[in-house]
Amino acid sequence: MYQTTAALRSAFLEYFRTNGHQVVDSSSLVPVNDPTLLFTNAGMNQFKDVFLGEDKRSYTRATSSQRCVRAGGKHNDLDNVGYTARHHTFFEMLGNFSFGDYFKREAISFAWNFLTQELKLPKERLCVTIYETDDEAFDIWTKEIGVPAESLIRIGDNKGAPYASDNFWQMGDTGPCGPCSEIFYDHGDHIWGGRPGTPEEDGDRFIEIWNIVFMQYNRQASGEMLPLPKPSVDTGMGIERIAAIMQGVHSNYEIDIFQALIKKTAEILGVTDLENKSLRVISDHIRSCAFLIADGVMPSNEGRGYVLRRIIRRAVRHGNKLGATSSFFYKLVPTLIEVMGDAAKGLVETQAIVEKSLKAEEEQFARTLERGLGILDGALNELKGDVLDGETAFKLYDTYGFPVDLTADVCREREITVDEAGFEVAMAEQRSRAQAAGQFDTDYNDSLKIDEETHFSGYTELTAQGKVTAIYKAGESTDSLNAGEDAVIVLDSTPFYGESGGQCGDKGLLTAKGVEFDVKDTQKYGQAVGHQGTVNSGSISVGDTLEAIVDKKLRHRTELNHSVTHLLHAALRQLLGTHVTQKGSLVDAERLRFDFSHFEGVKPEELKAVEDLVNTQIRRNHKLSADVMDMDQAKERGAMALFGEKYTDEVRVVTMGDFSIELCGGTHVGRTGDIGLFKITSEGGIAAGVRRIEAVTGAAAMAYVAAQKAELDQAAALLKADSNSVVTKLKAQLDRTKLLEKELSQLKDKLAAATSADLAGEAKQVNGAKVLIKKLEGVDAGALRGLQDELKQKLGSGVVVLAIAGEAKVNLIVGVTKDLTAKVKAGELVASIAAQVGGKGGGRPDMAQAGGTEPEKLDGALEQVLPWLEERLA
């Protein structure tokens, strides 16, 4: 019964569905609007606001099988994965939840009946822990469920503070909390370990399988515990642990899901030892990596993307350890989909993107992996002691892309630890250097702390009156300004848009009778809007009323570029995949720049399709609407939220027909048709996994097209062709050029052969070897190599030194016949000559080349060659 993990998952959800629970799909591994979490790490995460009373659902009972990741941040199991029986970066948490519905009696009964009646686990193999003072739970377990008192264990405050216990759960320092009951399974006395609460509890005999949390208190900042008006229940059972029990194995890595992945990895890599720990690491890591990418996380150098990159690179390193010579990790995705069953729905839809992303990241890391491992191996071999210094760990991170935990993983296998504190010092020093390099001129206005609040009226008007509430000059508050002075002016109300969300601040004028202030930029300072600029005429004081006039032309052009970024974002997601997310943008009156997550360069045909789709949406002339609503409403409407942006409870939703809907506080056109034309001017990578598109719109796009056409016409004129046949004519010219280059090369070879016959006669005898040292005139540098080969053949046994002097340039080549390389090394000789003419070079013992920048010193350098050779050929 329930021999597969998929069958067990279905049985759990069906059991609770028949007991009145709403089956809720697993939420994304990326927590929505919860800045406290890096990844979803528990079943209750998606119900957090329900427990806090901030969200209402249509149900009061729920059940789910939640995908979870623990890697990075506070909850980090990465270092232990592969080395223990139960640590994972990815796991599924089965759970049932009550939101003010049932409480202890029903929760305990549901859990016990599922384990003993549905799964038919022997009751004598189960024991239960409760919080020391939870007499209510004790009575339910013993008197109603019938668990013997000796199988019930009270756990007190074992973590050094009141209510700090393995059996007392709390969401944070304040808020909902309460005691919990944990059910343990006894794997048998053949495995070392003791019952919970004993000195041997960390052994593997007694394994926690289900935690039932009773949220019955609201903890105050004072520490006081106030009873909740509606107590709730949150439970969690790791599917891997219960699957191990049902499948009669002890380690999670022995269950069906992991065994399928382990065997597939072994098959791909040609490994026969299925107990190898590296196979465990890889089989675990493919689960977290694949599902993270499916949920929109892409490998990068920051935040969630960097955690993903660390996990992928750890898996790739273990594959390398097993002998992998090419990309293998992405090949596990089909097997993962097969064994995950219903839990793989989101993965099926994104399979192609997941595989491409994994392969691209693996190939990128493979370029530096071998060299980095060689440097690490050398450092460990020379190590005196058992601690690798932080500087070396940082070099591996900075130069070869080795996350510090990957370095620690390699060291661990040799019983060596990494000085992680030293690593952090080196990292901090690099940050300081980067910050220092980026600081040129100090702008005191950038760090202003302004308490005032400004009302923004610029969505509906570009001219309005505002009262001066504050003035800042050189970072200091002042009461007045005179002509010629630079300052930041804060108004109580303004139509000027302060830079935010990638949109640059407005420019324009602040005026009054006899007064003009030139606004060169507008910035936000908390709730205030600051107008940065210069007083052109008159004087301004706090309390004055000014007319605020936004530059309409600049604002309009900026709006074109901002609106089209929404269309571009939607087009990229539609054509490249939903993994595409905005990573940054810059929108001003001249152009737009849009950064987005993608694992490879955008192909020309894809870029054209994106541009065409955006222009199609422009021609459809969608009406734009901007509506303010609460965050939940926005989510229900499918609005795109941008990662890294902070949103308030009320958000502004910008909609463009049925094509784009995003949260945005910026200013936009009235209809997409106002944009006119969209032209992409460039696409490229700015970081691993992050691409950048630059583009223009409207009149700027027309000017760009006109410039391209003018360039095409100029090329046509040079080729003596019409603009429609430029490519054909150019291809013919290139083919002709290749043919001429081939003929030229053949002529040079003939010339070299003829020249070599003449030059060979100029060779001198030096201790039985022929030596030719010659500065050549009228010979192309490209012919030197062939010429020295010809001369070596003609000399039979000898040394050839040839040089060409040009304007501020020297070309050198040295050839040595193989019978003389024990005495004369070509690389050593050419380096000696090059050093005298302001250059350097090197090569093989029988042939080496070099360059220099001081041709005036060449004759003197060549005069030194003969004595150098006489000494070595003696």
UniProtKB/Swiss-Prot annotation:
GO CC annotation terms, alphabetical: cytosol
Transcription regulation recorded as keyword: no
UniProt keyword annotation of Protein transport present: no
Cofactor binding annotation: Binds 1 zinc ion per subunit.
GO biological process: alanyl-tRNA aminoacylation; negative regulation of DNA-templated transcription
SUPFAM superfamilies in the cross-refs: Class II aaRS and biotin synthetases, Putative anticodon-binding domain of alanyl-tRNA synthetase (AlaRS), ThrRS/AlaRS common domain, Translation proteins
InterPro entries assigned to the protein according to its UniProt record, in alphabetical order: aa-tRNA-synth_II/BPL/LPL, Ala-tRNA-lgiase_IIc, Ala-tRNA-ligase_IIc_anticod-bd, Ala-tRNA-synth_IIc_core, Ala-tRNA-synth_IIc_N, Ala-tRNA_ligase, Ala_tRNA_ligase_euk/bac, DHHA1_dom
Protein origin, superkingdom: Bacteria
UniProt cross-references to SMART domains, sorted A to Z: tRNA_SAD
Pfam assignment, any one: tRNA-synt_2c
Recorded domain comment: Consists of three domains; the N-terminal catalytic domain, the editing domain and the C-terminal C-Ala domain. The editing domain removes incorrectly charged amino acids, while the C-Ala domain, along with tRNA(Ala), serves as a bridge to cooperatively bring together the editing and aminoacylation centers thus stimulating deacylation of misacylated tRNAs.
HAMAP family for the chain: Ala_tRNA_synth_B
Name by which UniProt lists this protein: Alanine--tRNA ligase
Lineage of the species this protein comes from: Bacteria, Pseudomonadati, Pseudomonadota, Gammaproteobacteria, Alteromonadales
